[in-house]
């Protein structure tokens, strides 16, 4: 079984996975942003 959590916790590595630009780059990421907007989240993604 592979490790599932982010072991490298530097800011730049986290933003590559869950930053706004990273989310908007894929269809699934855009879906996440869409659902967070619908729910009324103040923070859509991790700020830069």
Swiss-Prot record:
Q: What InterPro entries does the record tag this protein with? A: Ribosomal_bL34 (IPR000271), Ribosomal_bL34_CS (IPR020939)
Offer one example of a GO biological process linked to this entry: translation
User: Cellular component terms, GO, for this chain's entry?
Assistant: chloroplast; mitochondrial large ribosomal subunit
Subcellular localization(s) per the UniProt record: Plastid, Chloroplast
Keywords carried by this UniProt record: Chloroplast, Plastid, Ribonucleoprotein, Ribosomal protein
**Tagged with keyword Ribonucleoprotein:** yes
Cross-referenced PROSITE patterns: RIBOSOMAL_L34
One Pfam annotation, family name?
Ribosomal_L34
Task: Give coiled-coil spans as residue ranges.
Answer: none
Which molecular function GO terms apply here? structural constituent of ribosome
Q: Which HAMAP family match?
A: Ribosomal_bL34 (MF_00391)
Q: Could you say which protein family the record assigns here? A: Belongs to the bacterial ribosomal protein bL34 family.
- Please state what the protein is called: Large ribosomal subunit protein bL34c
Gene field: rpl34
């Amino acid at each position: 079984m592979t490790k599932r959590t982010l072991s490298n916790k530097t800011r730049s590595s986290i933003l590559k996975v869950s930053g706004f630009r990273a989310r908007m780059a894929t269809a699934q990421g855009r879906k996440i942003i869409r659902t967070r907007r619908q729910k009324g989240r103040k923070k859509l993604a991790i700020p830069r």
